[in-house]
């Protein structure tokens, strides 16, 4: 029996064993061009764990399941993001994420001390993903009341928000040390399948990159009598084609290599390419797709080219070649987009401004969540909407004042945005003095403020790529029209400059003191360690005598 035949039989045996156990694994890649010169690639790796096999790990990562089970987590969302998503130009991603690290989770109703479990959960995930989640404490954790709602099959609970905790670390940097443990959670790790395309050298050179882990419970049947655990690992990348210096793209240009086939343990391995823009900017896919899928969803028509990747070990390279290089491109803004920036001057008072633009022809209700750290105190009395202290646009509000070094400031507003309008939210803050131990490294660079969260039920699916709540794989969006489309979006981050002491002064004093000590040490050391002896001096010798003495030495 040949080696290839033996490997094939072992692979078939493992796949049949996994199918008996009930676990399934899917890997998908979605490629979508952005006008005028960007390309969005979205990876998702879905592992569905049967409730009967949840105690054993066949395809699911045991380390992650142990954390979810030990700390009694019903739903978990964790992302690490570098860069800023441009909602006005690019629309909405499949999973939106705030810059830096973001973590929020719902705990089961049996958990009484949620804060204690929350700290243990963040510490465990910090070690698993080599991130700084151990810095999550009570002073940077909030409990959202309206902005975040679970996406899993949770039992009805009126106090579901009391089991929720949310925290973000906007200063967190995403690096290779985070990607490596993330890939080790996959069944094929980085040796086979779509994860082989995730080259850290290529990923971290993109305009925007985000990795995430999302765990939730979903219904395995229509009546939800059976529940499966869904573990979804995602990677979102946005490439600037101007840097590549070509509108033509391929796997080799984007990821540095081709696709070495599908993961042998995957039930399905599919590549979707959005070719909707092919009507205005013609391009040709190489090789041609196996099939073309047309989708009508919420007033938006989308066309996808589908590739089914097989686990045969053959290298696969998909690319696009554009025809006209100077084609006219027009981008349509999404129904809602926003902007956020800092006001003020000096080191005493300032303000945070959030602009909400409703580009749709009907009113849209949104929830705005502002999360200010304890060192940036905001007051509800300073809130102004379109320059006015009172406004009919606010339907409901929730405000939790912060406490110095103990809890952050938390503000949520339920608003109704008028059609074709721009709504401006302004809230003032004060600058405070910190203890010198509380300043981060390079304090003069500034202090990062986390993103605001914008939650809305969109009336249209224009520029909307998120999956339905009941869907796991990407094919669930095909013709998935709904009365509304939930969107949880993040604004851009902000940075403020707090009053910072002159940390260079101690450095200068130390340098001066060390210099003085060094200059004084040499002479003092010589005086204390050397013996001073008088050197006898004779009569002075003239130059003529020195020459004569020299000749005498030569004669001798």
What are the roles of these predicted feature ranges?
Residues 306-351:
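Edge strands and adjacent loops of beta-rich recognition modules
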Residues 375-419, 423-432, 469-471:
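A surface/secretory-pathway sequence property marking extracellular, secreted
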Residues 18-242:
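Long, solvent-exposed N-terminal ectodomains/accessory regions
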Residues 103-105, 110-149, 154, 247, ...:
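Serine/threonine-enriched low-complexity regions used as flexible
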Residues 3-22:
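Cleavable N-terminal signal peptides of Sec/SRP-targeted secreted and luminal proteins
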Residues 318-322, 338-339, 368, 423-433:
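Short, hydrophobic/aromatic-enriched beta-strand segments in well-ordered soluble domains
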Residues 343-371:
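Short beta-strand elements of extracellular/lumenal beta-sandwich folds
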Residues 117, 207, 211, 234-239, ...:
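Low-complexity, intrinsically disordered segments enriched in Ser/Thr together with acidic residues
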């Amino acid at each position: 029996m040949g080696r290839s035949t033996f490997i094939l039989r072992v692979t078939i045996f493992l796949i049949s064993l996994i199918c008996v156990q009930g676990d399934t694994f899917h890997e998908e890649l979605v490629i979508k061009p952005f006008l005028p010169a960007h390309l969005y690639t979205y990876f998702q790796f879905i592992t569905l764990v049967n409730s009967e096999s949840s105690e054993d790990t066949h395809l699911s990562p045991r380390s992650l399941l142990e954390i979810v089970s030990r700390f009694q987590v019903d739903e978990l969302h964790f992302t690490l993001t570098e860069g800023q998503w441009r909602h006005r130009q690019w629309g909405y991603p499949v999973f939106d994420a705030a810059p830096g690290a973001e973590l929020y989770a719902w705990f089961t109703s049996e958990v009484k001390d949620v804060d204690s479990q929350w700290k243990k959960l963040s510490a465990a995930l910090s070690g698993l993903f080599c991130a700084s989640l151990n810095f999550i404490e009570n002073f940077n954790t909030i409990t959202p009341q309206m902005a975040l709602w679970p996406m899993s099959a949770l039992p009805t609970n009126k106090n579901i928000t009391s089991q929720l905790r949310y925290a973000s670390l906007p200063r967190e940097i995403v690096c290779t040390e985070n990607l490596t443990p993330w890939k080790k959670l996959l069944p094929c790790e980085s040796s086979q399948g779509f994860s082989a395309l995730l080259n850290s050298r290529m990923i971290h050179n993109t305009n925007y990159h985000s990795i995430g882990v999302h765990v939730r419970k979903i219904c395995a049947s229509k009546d939800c009598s059976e529940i499966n655990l869904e573990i979804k690992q995602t990677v979102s990348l946005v490439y600037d084609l101007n840097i590549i210096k070509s509108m033509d793209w391929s796997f080799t240009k984007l990821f540095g290599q081709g696709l070495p086939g599908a993961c042998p343990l995957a039930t399905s391995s599919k590549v979707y390419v959005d070719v909707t823009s092919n009507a205005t900017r013609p391009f040709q896919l190489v090789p041609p797709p196996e099939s073309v899928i047309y989708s009508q969803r919420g007033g938006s028509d989308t066309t996808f080219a589908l590739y089914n990747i097989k686990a045969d070990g053959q290298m696969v390279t998909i690319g696009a070649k554009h025809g006209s290089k100077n084609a006219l491109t027009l981008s349509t803004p999404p129904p809602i987009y926003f902007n956020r920036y800092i006001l003020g001057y000096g080191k005493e008072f300032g303000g945070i401004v959030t602009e909400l633009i409703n580009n749709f022809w009907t009113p849209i209700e949104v929830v705005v969540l502002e999360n200010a750290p304890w060192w940036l105190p905001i007051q509800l009395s300073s809130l102004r909407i379109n320059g006015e202290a009172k406004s009919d646009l606010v339907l409901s509000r929730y405000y939790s004042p912060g406490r110095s070094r103990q809890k952050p400031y938390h503000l949520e507003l339920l608003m109704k945005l008028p059609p074709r309008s721009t709504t401006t939210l302004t809230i003032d803050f004060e600058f405070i003095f910190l203890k010198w131990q509380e300043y981060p490294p390079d304090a003069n660079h500034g202090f990062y403020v986390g993103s605001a969260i914008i939650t809305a039920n969109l009336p249209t699916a224009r520029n909307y790529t998120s999956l339905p709540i009941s869907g796991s794989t990407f094919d669930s969006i095909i013709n998935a029209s709904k009365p509304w489309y939930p969107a949880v979006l993040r604004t851009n981050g902000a940075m403020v400059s707090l009053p910072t002491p002159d940390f260079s002064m101690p450095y200068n004093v130390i340098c001066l003191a060390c210099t003085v000590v060094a200059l004084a040490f040499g002479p003092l050391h010589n005086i204390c360690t050397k013996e001073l002896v008088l050197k006898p001096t004779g009569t002075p010798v003239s130059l003529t005598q020195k020459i004569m003495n020299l000749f005498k030495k030569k004669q001798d």
